[in-house]
């Protein structure tokens, strides 16, 4: 399944309720699973982004449903990128 990397930043609401971030990330897993998405990793980060999440989904529309659900809660803003494993990238670049 395609991999997606989601870069998140806390909104004012997310910063105000930062102590519950871990619980919200835990609740993301079953919500994503119900929509057919597997959460591979969540990391709280320092620097430009506050949270990095790696997920697998069947397609862009499926990941968009999860991201829309997350955004509707108002705690973060996101940027989503399609990621490739090293092996996927190797297959893409073999013909170059």
Predicted segments with their positions:
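Generic structural signal for residues in well-ordered beta-strands
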Residues: 39-42, 78-80
């Amino acid at each position: 399944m395609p991999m997606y990397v989601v870069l998140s930043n806390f909104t004012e609401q997310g910063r105000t309720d930062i102590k519950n971030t871990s619980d919200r990330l835990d609740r993301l897993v079953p919500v994503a699973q119900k929509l057919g998405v597997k959460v591979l990793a969540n990391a709280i980060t320092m620097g430009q982004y506050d949270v990095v999440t790696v997920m697998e989904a069947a397609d862009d529309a499926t990941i968009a449903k999860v991201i829309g659900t997350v955004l509707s809660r108002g705690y973060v803003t996101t940027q989503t990128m399609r990621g490739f494993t090293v092996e996927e990238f190797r297959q893409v670049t073999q013909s170059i």
